[in-house]
Amino acid sequence: MYGILVLEDGTIIRGDGFGAETEVLGELVFNTSMTGYVEILTDPSYKGQIVTMTYPLEGNYGVEKEWFESDGIKAEGFVVKDMTGLKLDEFLKEYNIPGISGVDTRYITRKIRSKGVIRSLLKTSTNPITKDEETELIKKVVEYPDISEIDLVPEVSTKETVVYSADDEKTKCVLIDCGVKQSIVNCLVERGCSVIKVPYNSKKEEILSYTPDFVLVSNGPGDPENMAETVDTVKNLIGTLPVTGICLGHQIITIALGGKTYKLKFGHRGGNQPVKDIESGKVYITSQNHGFATDDCVVPTGSELMHMNLNDDTVEGIRKIESEDLKNTVWSVQYHPEAGPGPHDARFLFDEMVELGIKFKAEKAN
């Protein structure tokens, strides 16, 4: 099958198509992980994006449902140097997702690093793609909106409340689902925290009706500036019970506290991002997947920076300056402590969330 990747600047990259025979548009990004293609493809945060893998060989260890981070592939397309094994090809076909292999992924990655993330089109076809078709495809890419103009969260958030019960429940949280990864839910449930997953646009009254011990705002795709409903809910929740966040949830909390976010040139996507804990000086290798960040020049009033990225000094965590009253506790991280894929250096943060919930539960009982 023929494959073609068309970039907004008119660049045409031809290769071998695999997966579904179709055509998709999206923001072209790169991921530096050496493993974890199943988790990456099924991560809801990749909605609206075509993912290029910098590691050259993909598909060599198959596909298993237990590795899924959602109910199916959420990335729009997949770009690899070499694809091996039928399972990856069949996996993409099952979810009607195109892939292209046999292309210079180093060239693509350098281009993204130099120019920034790029609007692109990926087309696969059993018939050769003509020069006349190329012209039409370039036109489609140029007319495609920037990802910040697309409201992606409604496409990946749960439509109804879902409960994940811990066998030995120690605490309970409401998870505001902006496109949560299953690994996040698993990390909480394994630690004795029951999780009530609610839609991104749930209101304060509904959330409090579940009597949670804390709230977690999840990861997800797109620009946090599009999340006005969720931001308002988080504003109203702060001061009522502890609030935490991961990735997009971190950005939403930043805005809710009065801070600002901005779009990164090419984002952080991979399993090898070094993050420094400012207070302790410890460094953790983290898994990341984001294209927006907290503006360190507009730190929310009454808050402080918690973690920083050692590669580019961007903000990786903030917290509201601590109060003796647990209901005022607010903290969030930009990276993914659950990994999936990636190192587990930061999974202790789920222990801290659960401990926070247990303490607040006890405080409420007194």
UniProtKB/Swiss-Prot annotation:
Entry-linked HAMAP family: CPSase_S_chain
Q: What is this protein called?
A: Carbamoyl phosphate synthase small chain
- Description of how the protein assembles with itself and partners: Composed of two chains; the small (or glutamine) chain promotes the hydrolysis of glutamine to ammonia, which is used by the large (or ammonia) chain to synthesize carbamoyl phosphate. Tetramer of heterodimers (alpha,beta)4.
Active site positions, chain numbering: 247, 336, 338
Organism phylogeny: Archaea, Methanobacteriati, Methanobacteriota, Methanomada group, Methanococci
Q: What keywords are assigned to this protein?
A: Amino-acid biosynthesis, Arginine biosynthesis, ATP-binding, Glutamine amidotransferase, Ligase, Nucleotide-binding, Pyrimidine biosynthesis
Name the SMART domains on file.
Answer: CPSase_sm_chain
UniProt record similarity statement: Belongs to the CarA family.
